[in-house]
């Protein structure tokens, strides 16, 4: 059980990193470093941004649940 949660935690961490980097930059952040500042004016549907926000929040919730579950398993085993 703990091994499965650890694997899910690693995958969720990687996915969350990718999803956060995919967000449009609102300033001089990391996304504008890779050319996101130029593309943000040319493309970007609000539906895509909302879906990306939802997926990012879902992955963050999965990440938090895995951390809490692993802590509980470690505490009570």
From Swiss-Prot:
Organism: Corynebacterium glutamicum (strain ATCC 13032 / DSM 20300 / JCM 1318 / BCRC 11384 / CCUG 27702 / LMG 3730 / NBRC 12168 / NCIMB 10025 / NRRL B-2784 / 534)
One function term, GO molecular function aspect: protein-transporting ATPase activity
Reported function: Involved in protein export. Participates in an early event of protein translocation.
Pfam families: SecG
One Gene Ontology cellular component: plasma membrane
Family: Belongs to the SecG family.
Subcellular location: Cell membrane
GO BP: intracellular protein transmembrane transport; protein secretion; protein transport by the Sec complex
Keywords: Cell membrane, Membrane, Protein transport, Translocation, Transmembrane, Transmembrane helix, Transport
Membrane topology of the entry: Multi-pass membrane protein
Transmembrane segments: 2-22, 55-75
Protein's recorded name: Protein-export membrane protein SecG
């Amino acid at each position: 059980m703990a091994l499965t949660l650890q694997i899910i935690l690693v995958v969720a961490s990687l996915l969350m990193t990718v999803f956060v980097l995919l967000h449009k930059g609102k300033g001089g952040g990391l996304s504008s470093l890779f050319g996101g500042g130029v593309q943000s004016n040319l493309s970007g549907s609000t539906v895509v941004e909302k879906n990306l926000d939802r997926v990012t929040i879902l992955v963050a919730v999965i990440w938090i649940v895995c951390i809490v579950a692993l802590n509980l398993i470690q505490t009570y085993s």
